[in-house]
Amino acid sequence: DLADIFNEMLDRMRSYTELQEQFVEDVSHELRTPVAVIEGHLSMLNRWGKDDPEILAESLEASMQEIKRMKTLVQEMLDLSRAEQVNIHYSNERTNAKEVVHQIVNNFRMIYPEFVFTLDDDLYSEKILKIYRNHFEQILIIVMDNAVKYSTDRKEVHISISTNLKELEIAIQDFGEGIPPEDVSRIFHRFYRVDKARARTKGGNGLGLSIASKLIDSYKGRIFAESSLGKGTIFRIFIPIQNTDEKE
């Protein structure tokens, strides 16, 4: 009857509004780190870099890279907002593993000077990953941002990269709050937060790890967490590598 039709219409409108709100939250979450990188470089230039050509050139180049990444990121977030299942159109894209990992770690060292970021690079040569560079950067930023956010007194993050015959493994370890055992399997669910009150104080909204997980799944990779409550968490990310006998 008319009442049922009206209620159905309201449900559709409510669903659409929720999707729009999710999109705004997604974009806000994902743009925060690149904005911080640009702000850090501009602040450095404002203090002493204007008269140093080397610092000026380096900061401008890094800022331009982040602006370009932000523009691409907005389009990719539009894709994420349109469907729960990410459709990847970059199956032929390849990315240099060492280069990107070192770049992201250096960016975090600049943004969070109070933290110690230790990088153990066990790769003897560059490895080519079967993933779009912007997506790989996005995944690393999400997980490292999470490590920083939930660190406590011990402000350290350990990052290691190694490889087997088929995959690159990135391990990102913090020494913070940790995750209760019953929550570890659910942290990759969209909007899931271990402690909503605590997440609000830290700016968390339960989006980042869900996005990272979807992107990794789309490239036939894996991500999982090992955690000890009160001692910290290790995230392990596995991304397929291109073997030397494979065609570009």
List the predicted regions and their residue ranges.
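Short helix N-cap motif at coil->helix boundaries in the Bergerat
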Residues: 97, 178-189
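Acidic ATP/Mg2+-coordinating residue in the GHKL
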Residues: 174
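Short alpha-helical segment of the dimerization/phosphotransfer core of two-component systems
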Residues: 65-70
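Conserved catalytic submotifs in the C-terminal HATPase_c
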Residues: 91-94, 114-127, 131, 165
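Membrane-proximal HAMP signal-relay module
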Residues: 1-24, 41-50, 61, 82, ...
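Short beta-strand/loop element within the Bergerat-fold HATPase_c
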Residues: 154-166
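A conserved beta-strand-to-alpha-helix junction within the catalytic ATP-binding
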Residues: 91-109, 116
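Short helix-loop "hinge" at the ATP-lid/N-box region of the Bergerat-fold HATPase_c
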Residues: 147-148
